[in-house]
A protein has these predicted regions:
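N-terminal glycine-rich cofactor-binding segment
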Residues: 3-22, 39-72, 87, 108-119
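Glycine-rich beta-strand-centered segment in the early N-terminal region that forms part
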Residues: 21-35, 50-98, 137-139
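NAD(P)H dinucleotide-binding glycine-rich loop of Rossmann-like/cofactor-binding domains
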Residues: 64, 92-175
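Mid-domain Rossmann-like dinucleotide-binding core that forms the NAD(H)/NADP(H) cofactor-binding site
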Residues: 138-222, 227
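Glycine-rich phosphate-binding loop and adjacent beta-alpha segment
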Residues: 215, 247-310, 347-353
Length: 353
């Protein structure tokens, strides 16, 4: 089979022919329909400082946002059968640590990531734990299924710990409208937010945010986001702030435009320490600060399925580019250009379910 491989600890990747892997006990072999490019994949492709410190096995096949058809099942697999169309949860949990045993497998102490710690999905076939294969029902386009994993990140951040009830009829601010931020705009709109405010310096992504349902678009290059949000909310601020950028200045602004008693979900990863006014902007506000990683397994997947299968969120505008796998260099260049949102690649000739 063809697979995109990180063949050496240096920038770039190679398209190679490698054997089709066999599923072991508790595993399934998935014939990949589509895989989308994530920021993690860009790091690995560029072989930046993060990748050098995180990726421990080279050569390897990378890529982790994926959907496809189960081609074969290993021993002791009972809940998923050959021919099922699945999306894949990329957090591979141990199942036995204290966090797994208390229902928080997405923050497993021994967590492994598909396409980082194991061979991934930029290939014609990929082996994954059967428990990580989420059966995609009718009503979800196969291409959309390939981005259910990052869409789930946005679902987790937007729903928070209260099932999204704090969004209903309230103003919501999304800071950073990359793909996950754009997804969050659509989710907040679907959950009944009174006003969805998108804060994003990139002109094209602000336009996409409007297509996803944003009511107010703020360019932080020309307008003060704190003043703009306070003006739009009668001085109250946003009841929910979804911070997707990881930018230190934006995170600080997020606490300042957050309403008293409001909730701020942090998903964007800053490059280093961030300075915040904890006294006035967090403690005295009784702000709820919620760190977000991955997806709750598998509550988030059910929420994701409902939003997509019912059409409550249309993610078509976010998928801006499609490439066959043999044009991977162009695909990665496009994903890193700032002129794309979600880029998906197709390893096989047949792009239909």
């Amino acid at each position: 089979m063809r697979a995109l491989r990180k063949t050496a600890p240096r920038p770039g990747a190679e398209l190679e022919d490698v054997p089709v892997p066999d599923p072991g006990e508790g595993e399934v072999l998935v014939r990949v329909h589509a895989a989308s490019i994530c920021g993690t994949d860009l790091h690995i492709f560029d072989w930046n400082e993060w990748a050098q410190g995180r990726v421990t096995r080279v050569p390897m096949t990378f890529g982790h946002e994926v959907a496809g058809t189960v081609e074969a099942v290993g021993p002791e697999v009972h809940h998923v059968q050959r021919g099922a169309f699945v999306a894949v949860e990329t957090h591979i949990a141990c199942g036995v640590c204290s966090t797994c045993r208390t229902g928080r497998a997405h923050i497993c102490r021994n967590l492994k990531i598909l396409g980082v710690d194991t061979d991934g999905a930029f290939a014609e076939y990929v082996v994954v734990p059967a428990v990580n294969a989420w059966i995609v029902g009718e009503g979800i386009h196969p291409d959309h299924a390939s981005v259910m994993e990052p869409f789930g990140n946005a679902v987790h951040a937007t729903f928070g710990t209260e099932g999204g009830e704090d969004l209903l009829t309230n103003p919501v601010a999304v800071i950073g409208c990359g793909p996950i931020g754009l997804f969050a705009v659509g989710i907040a709109r679907a959950l009944g937010a009174w006003k969805v405010i998108a804060i994003e310096p990139n002109d094209e992504r602000r336009s996409l945010a409007a297509k996803m349902g944003a009511d107010l678009l703020i360019d932080p290059k020309t307008d003060d986001p704190v003043e703009a949000v306070l003006d739009a909310t009668d001085g109250n601020g946003a009841e929910v702030v979804l911070e997707m950028s990881g930018n230190a200045t934006a995170i600080d602004q997020g606490t300042r435009l957050l309403a008293r008693g409001g909730r701020m979900s942090l998903l964007g990863l800053p490059d280093g320490p961030v300075t915040l006014d904890l006294n006035d902007q967090v403690i005295f506000k009784e702000a709820r600060i919620l760190g977000i990683t991955g997806r709750q397994m598998f509550r988030t997947w059910q929420q994701t399925t409902t939003l997509l299968s019912t059409g409550r969120v249309d993610i078509s505008p976010v998928i801006t580019h499609r490439f066959p796998l043999d044009r991977f260099e162009e695909a990665f260049e496009t994903a890193a250009s700032g002129h794309a949102a979600k880029v998906i690649v197709f390893p096989g000739a047949n792009h239909q379910r």
